[in-house]
Structure formats: C-alpha cells, structure tokens
C-alpha cells in the first residue's frame, strides 16, 4: 500500500504536463512530418522526378544568367542610371537569388529530402519565400514608380538615389522577415495537428497569410496599371481631338495595353494557380492538391525567368546593350553620361509617355492661346526678369 501511494504522484505528473503543454517535435525526422501530412516522400529517383529536376535546373541556370545580364547591362550603360532602372536591377537581383534558391531546392528534393533536418528544411523553404517576396515587392515598386511618372508626365522620376536605396532596403528587409517567420516560430512543429499537406512543417495559418498577402499585392498592381491605362486613354482621346496624329496616339495606347496585359498575364499565369492551391490545401481537405504541386512550382519558377524579358528585353537600348556585352563590344554610353542622357528614354518608357508628353503640351498651348492667357507648363522655366533699360521703347 505504501509503495503504491508513493509511486502514484510520479506517474500523474507527466500526464498533467503532456495535457497542458504543447509537444514539440524538433528532433523528429522529415519523414515523420511527411507521413503525418500524407505527402509522399520518395525513396528513389523515378523518371518523372528526374525530368522535373532536369527541367528545374535548366530553368534555374537561365534565370541566373538572364538576370545577371540585366544587372551588368544597367551597370555599364550610364543611360540606365535612373530610379526605374535601379528598381529593375533590384528585381533582377531578386530573381537571380530566386534562381539560386530554386537551384538549392532541386538538389534537396525527391529522395534527398529524407536527409534534411528540420532546420535545413526550413532554410530551404525560407530561401524561396524570401526571394519570391522580394521579387513580388519589386514588381509592386516598379508599378508604383510607373504610376508616378505617368501622372507627372515625366520619362523618369526625380526621386533621389538615397530614396531609391531606402526603397530597396525596405524591400529586402520585408522579404527577409517574411522568409524567416516560419523558422522563428510560425510553424507546426509544436502544433502538429495544423500542419499543411503541401509544406508538412508549415502551419496552415501561415500559408493562408502568405497566399493572401501575395494576392493582395497582385490586386494592387491590377488597380495601379488599370489607373494608368485609363489615364493615358483619356489623355489620348483628348489629344486626338486637337492634333493631327491620332494614329500615333492610338499606337501609344495600344502599346501600354500590351505591356499591361503582358505584366499582369505573366503574374496571373505564373502565380495565381500556386496561391490558389495553397488556399485549397487549407480550405479543401478532400482536394488532391499534391498531384499538381510540382507543376505549379515550376510555373512559379518561370516567373523569375520572364521578368527580365518583360521589363528589359522590350527596351531597344537594353537589347543593344545585351548584344554589346555578349559580343564583348564597348559602347559609347559606358564611358560616361551624355549631354542628352536625361532626355533619352527606353523604348518602353518612351512608348508609354513620349506621345502623351509632347502632344499634350501642344494641346495645352492651343487651349491657353484661345483663352488669351499664358501659363507655364510643368517642364518649362519662367522667362528671366528684364534688366533695367532693356524694356520696350
């Protein structure tokens, strides 16, 4: 009897602790989490896995080389030393590191996933989250910059280099924080019942947050570009009533429309399916989301390869700089800024703004002349004051 009464507190104490304290599984293997979530963990390389890995590595190499070419082109060509191109270079840097992150993923996926620890698995996913967030944030920053320049009737913003650096620092700070959140606590290691099926160590709540965050960013970009298109269309219609160049105005509007469709279309095609799949993973347990996971991962990876094409290769001078770099030729623009460098615009910027900028000034002058008044345009300077003795006689 005495022995029984002595041993009972020893047995009841662990039961009380287990019922009230969350149980964490930091020392468990990756296979433990995959088995609980029902996600298949391969033991050997099959044909499909080899094809996916080969295609993924090829895309990664193209991503890194293409974005490296963009960064070098912006560095060597002094005519690209403007805020919009600095943001494009930062976008290329984000996509370059995305290629590295995907490259690391390709060599630590499939059967190699079994060798990962909890920390290395979180690192693998955190690198992807960081670079993806930086890339999406750069796309948003470029959309905001284009919105400002169009509405101010400028080819380049007058934002100082210091402010550009601040924007870039904010982008990467936010990206690093977003990528590190699961590693510092927002995971399911201590909440095993709420683990995701697609990412077995990630919490369902984090994946919902991350998907909604990116979808909201997408909506903001849609609104910005729609506002730009509506504004340019309105100005173009106004100019067509006062100028003799309606075809040029129509071409300007259509060029902007094509650019918006390409930008938004690439984002929708590459990102929306994967983001919706993350939401279905949480909200639709009966949906077989794992069957489409690798396909949508490659699709999202292609976005980093398409960004240099959309934002850079459509620029004629950027294309010329590419050819000069690849052919090891020296350009006149690499030696220093030219006198008219501030007025030289990329074909992308010029297509959107040049016709609006020049023709709208002529329309404004015609209107003010009809009213008999004189107004200064935004880019014009007031006439110098007359000196004594130089007035009219």
From Swiss-Prot:
Organism: Ovis aries (Sheep)
Keyword Membrane: yes
Sequence positions bearing Phosphothreonine: 351
Region (Disordered): 369-393
Family: Belongs to the G-protein coupled receptor 1 family.
GO cellular component: cell surface; endosome; plasma membrane
One GO BP annotation of this record: regulation of cell shape
Sequence positions bearing Phosphoserine: 341
Residues that bind a 1-acyl-sn-glycero-3-phosphate: 39, 124-129, 210
One Pfam family matching this protein: 7tm_1
Compartments reported by the entry: Cell surface; Cell membrane; Endosome
Expression by tissue: Detected in brain cortex and in pituitary pars tuberalis.
A single MF term (Gene Ontology): lysophosphatidic acid receptor activity
Lineage, uppermost ranks: Eukaryota, Metazoa, Chordata, Craniata, Vertebrata
Cytoplasmic-facing ranges: 76-83, 145-163, 226-255, 316-393
Full protein name: Lysophosphatidic acid receptor 1
């Amino acid at each position: 009897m005495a022995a029984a009464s002595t041993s009972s507190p020893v047995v009841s104490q662990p039961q009380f602790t287990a019922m009230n304290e969350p149980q964490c599984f930091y020392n468990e293997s990756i296979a433990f989490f995959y088995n609980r979530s029902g996600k298949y963990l391969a033991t050997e390389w099959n044909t499909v896995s080899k094809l996916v890995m080969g295609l993924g590595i090829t895309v990664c190499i193209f991503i890194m080389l293409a974005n490296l070419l963009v960064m070098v082109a912006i560095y060597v060509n002094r005519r690209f030393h403007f805020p919009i191109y600095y943001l494009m270079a930062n976008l290329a840097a984000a996509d370059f590191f995305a290629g590295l992150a995907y490259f690391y993923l390709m060599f630590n996926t499939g059967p190699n996933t079994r060798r990962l620890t909890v920390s290395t698995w979180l690192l693998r996913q955190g690198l992807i989250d960081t670079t993806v967030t930086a890339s999406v944030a750069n796309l948003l920053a470029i959309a905001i910059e284009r919105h400002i320049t169009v509405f101010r009737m400028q080819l380049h913003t007058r934002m100082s280099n210091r402010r550009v650096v601040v924007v870039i620092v904010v982008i990467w700070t936010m990206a690093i924080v977003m990528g590190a959140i699961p590693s510092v606590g927002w995971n399911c290691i201590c909440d095993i019942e709420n683990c995701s099926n697609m990412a077995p160590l990630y919490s369902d709540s984090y994946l919902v947050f991350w998907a909604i965050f990116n979808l909201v960013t997408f909506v903001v970009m849609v609104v910005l570009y729609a506002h730009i298109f509506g504004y340019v269309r309105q100005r173009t219609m106004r100019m067509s009533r006062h100028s003799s160049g309606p075809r040029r105005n129509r071409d300007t509007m259509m060029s902007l429309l094509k650019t918006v469709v390409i930008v938004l279309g690439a984002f929708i095609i590459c990102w929306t399916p994967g983001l919706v799949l993350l939401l279905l993973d949480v909200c639709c347990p009966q949906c077989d989301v794992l069957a489409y996971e690798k396909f949508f991962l490659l699709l999202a990876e292609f976005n980093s390869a398409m960004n240099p094409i959309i934002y850079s290769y459509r620029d004629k001078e950027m294309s010329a700089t590419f050819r000069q770099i690849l052919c090891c030729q020296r350009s006149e623009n690499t030696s220093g800024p030219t006198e008219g460098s501030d007025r030289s615009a990329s074909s992308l910027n010029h297509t959107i703004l040049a016709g609006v900028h020049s023709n709208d000034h002529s329309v404004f002058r015609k209107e003010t002349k009809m009213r008999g008044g004189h107004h200064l345009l935004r880019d014009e300077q007031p006439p110098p004051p007359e000196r004594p003795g130089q007035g009219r006689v």
